[in-house]
């Protein structure tokens, strides 16, 4: 694969007017497979720039992630990207997984360090014979060749970063290792995203940074997810959505409105696109698209 030229996601983002993309997770059972298929079918007509498939903690979904991403490559018109983490794998195992992706027709990878084996907030320990950080995984992907590679970015800073500037320095290191684009963790204030971009550009980060959008359809669920990342949903967002507590329909509508307004502000401010965390459901994303007057 070394030396092959891939028209990857980084190129697609730079070439297009704006990018829309969706994230899915590997289903655990037949019902989950059906739900994912429905979501993909509903969102495919919107011609996303790409779709991504997550990688379970400690490599727990390794085979499923490769299989699902490969199916998207072979059975749909979509450009798939597989996630890959350092956690629980040796360098040789990571190389084998990348070759499995290539054999399945997947040529885009999101390279992540991953959460510590004992869970978010616990000390990070690399696997013996493995890699320590995402920039090392990016370098391995580029060494193997034939892939376009993206990385994560953090508008509010990674929980382990010493400061926001330190966090940007880490992103710059991933770019220097070969990353072609970045996708942010979820956030709820446009100023957090634009602050990241400003700090990044000042430090020399010039790859596209896609904002990651998490629609709030269940406030408690999203609050738990934010806590796992070491942050909180902003009080103004919580108050706006929680004002409808007891009325699930109204809670959902308020959450969708919050996300749609955020998306409008991001696009108006020059964000290169939007990456939606779908949780394998299409309805919330389609409702946001309707609010944005997105056409296909």
Ranges and model annotations:
Residues 35, 86-103, 128-132:
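Glycine-rich anion/phosphate-binding loops
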Residues 3-10, 33-41, 46, 59-78:
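Glycine-rich, positively charged N-terminal anion/phosphate-binding segment
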Residues 24-30, 48-68, 116-128, 180-193, ...:
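Glycine-rich, proline-tolerant flexible connector loops at the mouths of alpha/beta enzymes
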Residues 1-22, 29-30, 34, 142, ...:
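N-terminal amphipathic alpha-helix/helix-capping segment at the start of soluble metabolic enzymes
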Residues 19-35, 57, 80-92, 148-166, ...:
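Active-site mouth loops of central-metabolism enzymes
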């Amino acid at each position: 694969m070394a030396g092959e030229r891939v028209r990857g996601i980084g190129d697609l983002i730079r070439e297009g007017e704006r990018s829309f993309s969706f994230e899915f997770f590997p289903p655990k059972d037949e019902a989950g497979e059906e739900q994912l298929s429905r979501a993909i079918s509903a969102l495919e007509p919107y011609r996303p720039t790409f779709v991504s498939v997550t990688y379970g903690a400690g490599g727990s979904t390794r085979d499923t992630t490769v299989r699902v991403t490969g199916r998207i490559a072979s059975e749909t018109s979509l450009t798939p990207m597989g996630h890959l983490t350092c956690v629980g794998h040796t360098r040789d195992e990571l190389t084998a997984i990348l070759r499995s992706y290539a054999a399945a027709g997947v040529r885009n990878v999101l390279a992540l360090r991953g959460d510590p084996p004992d869970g978010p907030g616990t000390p990070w320990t690399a696997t013996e014979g493995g890699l320590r950080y995402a920039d090392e995984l990016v370098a391995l992907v580029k060494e193997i060749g034939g892939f376009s590679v993206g990385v994560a970015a953090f508008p509010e800073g990674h929980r382990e970063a010493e400061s926001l500037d330190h966090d940007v320095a880490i992103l710059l290191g991933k770019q220097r290792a070969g990353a072609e684009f970045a996708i942010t963790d979820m956030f709820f204030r446009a100023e957090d995203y634009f602050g990241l971009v400003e700090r990044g550009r000042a430090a020399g980060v010039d790859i596209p940074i896609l904002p990651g959008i998490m629609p709030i359809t269940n406030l408690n669920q999203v609050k738990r997810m934010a806590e796992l990342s070491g942050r909180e949903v902003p009080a103004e967002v919580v108050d706006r959505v929680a004002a409808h507590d007891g009325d699930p329909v109204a809670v959902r509508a308020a959450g969708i409105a919050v996300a749609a307004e955020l998306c409008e502000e991001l696009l108006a401010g020059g964000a290169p696109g939007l990456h939606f965390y779908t949780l394998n459901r299409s309805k919330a994303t389609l409702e946001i698209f309707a609010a944005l007057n997105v056409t296909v």
